[in-house]
Regions:
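A generic structural signal for tightly packed, nonpolar segments enriched in small/aliphatic residues
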Residues: 1-183
Length: 183
């Protein structure tokens, strides 16, 4: 692996977003809620091998955009980008991406508060729902212009921006795969 051993112990938690999405579907079904919900679990085995991604590889995301790999540790967003594009084919009213996307979120908000980013309306509704259920969430912006840190000379964008604003930058990257008008 490319991570230091101390960080590898935490990687089993990288599937927490997919687990939360799956459990949400089970809970909705058990409660018999009158809603139509689909969960897209963006799953991948991340192991080094001769066919693993390398720095400077250019990948084509589902839907056609190309991404230059500049950081092999920013791999989760590549899988999520595929899932976001595919999920939009179902014309959903709302897409909620649940992910342990970046350690920058923990640096910014600690271990108990989740950062929430998105359109103002959707983000605010999620924060209110979280408050009602006792889950601390904090609304975060997606600064305009943040996507410029993902500029690439060989692809539509890179998979990693600069070091500042890591959580916000990761969201700006994923926003590139969501069509205008989708919440």
């Amino acid at each position: 692996s490319l991570k230091p051993p101390a960080k590898m112990e935490e990687m089993k938690s990288d599937m927490a977003g997919a687990a939360a999405a799956a459990q949400s579907i089970f809970a909705i079904a058990r409660l018999g809620l009158p809603v139509r919900v689909t969960a897209w679990l963006a799953l991948a085995e991340n192991m080094p091998s001769g066919s693993a991604q390398r720095p400077a590889d250019v990948l084509r995301i589902y839907g056609g955009k190309t991404v230059e790999v500049t950081n092999t540790d920013a791999e989760g967003r590549l899988v999520l980008a595929d899932a976001l594009v595919a999920a939009q084919e179902e014309s959903p009213d709302l897409i909620v991406d649940i992910a342990t996307l970046t350690g920058a979120q923990v640096v910014a908000l600690g271990l108990r508060t989740t950062g929430v980013m998105g359109t103002d309306d959707a983000r605010n509704k999620l924060v209110l729902a979280a408050e009602a259920s006792g889950e601390p969430m904090w609304p975060m912006p997606i600064p305009e212009g943040m996507i410029r840190s993902f500029d690439s000379n060989t692809a539509d964008l890179t998979n990693a921006g600069g070091r500042s604003g890591g959580m916000l930058a990761a969201t700006a990257f994923l926003q590139e795969f969501v069509e205008d008008g989708v919440e």
